[in-house]
């Protein structure tokens, strides 16, 4: 009888010790959530998604900007952009101005590598010892490489174009090359960074010129889907 009682006691004790261990293992197993798939992007090759709306704020050079994008379908989005600049069109010239544009992006290739065409036509107004008014915007292509579900690296080329009607009147353009990155914090929030650099050419009523233009921006994007 004593041996049987000791056996029951040992079994009950083993069960009591094993239960919290299995419970903790189950809790640990169920509490680890998989990283969400990066099925949208703010500045790389993917769009924001059909019916989704994205808000993005960026700061750096040549200024501070706010962008709204709406997914028209799985491959294209369009929106509105406002830039408050303290640098002239990505050059080292310190001129204050504002840029209002309508960004458009079209995904051309999708998969582990995404390629998109993008443009941002609009108007620019600068205080350049008088009012400089112009129309134009960057046109370019970007390719995004998905290294992991939350991380995307990209390379791209943009050609900023500005047709100025006053102070001075003329035409400015130049190819800019560079790269960037996006990191998805959760399924709706991403941190972005991008850099572009290249020659900038100007043919205006004040004469012709060339200099180095660059863009360096860090941002935060939220997809309200």
Residue positions per predicted region:
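Bacterial N-terminal signal peptides that target proteins for export
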Residues: 2-11
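Positively charged, low-complexity intrinsically disordered regions
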Residues: 5, 25, 195-197
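Short glycine/proline- and aromatic-enriched beta-strand/turn motifs that initiate or cap beta-hairpins
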Residues: 21-87, 124, 221-225
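Short, surface-exposed coil-to-beta transition loops
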Residues: 63-65, 98-99, 137-138, 176
